[in-house]
Amino acid sequence: MLSALARPAGAALRRSFSTSAQNNAKVAVLGASGGIGQPLSLLLKNSPLVSRLTLYDIAHTPGVAADLSHIETRANVKGYLGPEQLPDCLKGCDVVVIPAGVPRKPGMTRDDLFNTNATIVATLTAACAQHCPEAMVCIIANPVNSTIPITAEVFKKHGVYNPNKIFGVTTLDIVRANTFVAELKGLDPARVNVPVIGGHAGKTIIPLISQCTPKVDFPQDQLATLTGRIQEAGTEVVKAKAGAGSATLSMAYAGARFVFSLVDAMNGKEGVVECSFVQSKETECTYFSTPLLLGKKGLEKNLGIGKITPFEEKMIAEAIPELKASIKKGEDFVKNMK
């Protein structure tokens, strides 16, 4: 059942460039001038699914918006600069994507970003709760394992929390898993789908290779190496960029893929499945990423973990303590805010 549904969204990204799709989504990008924000905004501007694109940052947004506005696609683009302009950026939005925050540098974990990015995410999501409480909120800012609990607690404080509308974007883990499996097996990566569950950092990233479509088999040593590469792929890019940033282009692609899937589902397309880090009852963690069936109102049905191998069970068991700690850290941050 799941594998039949779960041929997600490489197709959504391709379809988003066709002109037959409905063009009505009002999308805001918060952190639009950054390394992820600029290429993400370009991909969104290029899609006929988007009718209005509002860009926010604390620097350079008028320039980014002016540049993008010259592209011959239908989305109307406007830039907003600084906190006093944020409410206008958010009004009437259907989807808000938040890549804002500082990137990783060599030697840093995603968790090292916590102190800076926690404040940024709490501030931006408070504005969302006030000015577009009904919008879908897609969090890219790391550490996602903590920034999603932060977002949820902020929305609860404002009395507008809806767990079906807040998503931690883990799509890059799926994109990487698909790519690496395809490389090893000589397959077309656009036709490979590996569900990745758990969280979005290190060993909390759990690729379910046993559920890959098409079915693939690896010897245990190769499976362990492949899993490790998927888990540490972000660090691979940070090292390769040698201090010049983290994964920006692939993250922008993955973020756009998730947004297009979400908008497709909001437009009434059926059978749209993406993995995302959301409030969950699938494990003892209050948030957990699994394949989700998306619908007109966001998360329609959590499709759960499904049948897994002992190797995958062990990875889940090992990830849960770290995930619980990251979730608590995010929740405590909001509870202790002045």
Swiss-Prot record:
Transit peptide (residue range): 1-24
Post-translational modification: Acetylation is enhanced after treatment either with trichostin A (TCA) or with nicotinamide (NAM) with the appearance of tri- and tetraacetylations. Glucose also increases acetylation. Acetylation of Lys-239 and Lys-314 is observed in liver mitochondria from fasted mice but not from fed mice.
Annotated glycan sites: S33
Residues where Phosphoserine is found: S246, S326
Residues bearing the modification N6-malonyllysine: K239, K307, K329
EC number: 1.1.1.37
Catalyses which reaction(s): (S)-malate + NAD(+) = oxaloacetate + NADH + H(+)
GO MF terms, alphabetically ordered: L-malate dehydrogenase (NAD+) activity; L-malate dehydrogenase (NADP+) activity; malate dehydrogenase activity; protein homodimerization activity
Record localization: Mitochondrion matrix
Active site: H200 (proton acceptor)
Positions of modified residues (N6-acetyllysine): K78, K91, K165, K185, K215, K239, K296, K301, K307, K314, K324, K328, K329, K335
EC category: oxidoreductase
Activity regulation (record text): Enzyme activity is enhanced by acetylation.
InterPro entries the UniProt entry points to: L-lactate/malate_DH, Lactate/malate_DH_C, Lactate/malate_DH_N, Lactate_DH/Glyco_Ohase_4_C, Malate_DH_AS, Malate_DH_type1, NAD(P)-bd_dom_sf
Keywords: Acetylation, Glycoprotein, Mitochondrion, NAD, Oxidoreductase, Phosphoprotein, Transit peptide, Tricarboxylic acid cycle
Complex formation: Homodimer.
Xref: NCBIfam families: MDH_euk_gproteo
Protein name, per record: Malate dehydrogenase, mitochondrial
Protein's organism: Mus musculus (Mouse)
Gene: Mdh2
